[in-house]
């Protein structure tokens, strides 16, 4: 089985990535953040859910010899992440678009299909609670 993980997020993630960068700014009560394009959308999946799904996949006979996306099937924009963090921390942060963070060939939307994952496991992949995952970080 080949597992194609999408954007795994959660406790212990490298602070150089966008989600922990956002969380740390809110935790530190910073008033502004310099970012690139906040309208790009990515398929995030919780690290704990990822571990459970991998455990299930390695024992699922239907997954043998398959290439399977490890994803949630739903895209979330950076703007959406910021909105949820503003709800969690109770304040609005000023977003400054910084050209050094804007990618020339940005992929606007990157979302995986859960169809094969669900087929291999014989069950529906639970939807991630973005509020809960960000709160735990």
Where on the chain are the PLM-derived regions?
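Active-site Tyr-X1-5-Lys
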Residues: 1, 24-28
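Active-site micro-motifs of SAM-dependent methyltransferase domains
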Residues: 7-10, 24, 40
């Amino acid at each position: 089985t080949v597992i194609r993980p999408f954007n795994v997020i959660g406790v212990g993630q490298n602070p150089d990535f966008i989600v922990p960068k956002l969380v740390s700014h809110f935790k530190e009560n910073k008033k502004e953040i310099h970012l690139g394009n906040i309208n790009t959308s990515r398929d995030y999946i919780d690290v704990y859910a990822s571990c459970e799904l991998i455990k299930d996949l390695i024992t699922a006979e239907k997954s043998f010899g398959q290439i399977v996306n490890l994803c949630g099937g739903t895209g979330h924009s950076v703007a959406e992440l910021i909105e949820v963090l503003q709800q969690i921390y109770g304040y609005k942060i000023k977003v400054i678009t910084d050209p050094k963070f804007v990618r020339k060939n940005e992929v606007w939307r990157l979302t995986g299909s859960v169809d094969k994952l669900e087929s291999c496991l014989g069950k529906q992949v639970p939807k991630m609670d973005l509020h809960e995952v960000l709160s735990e970080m």
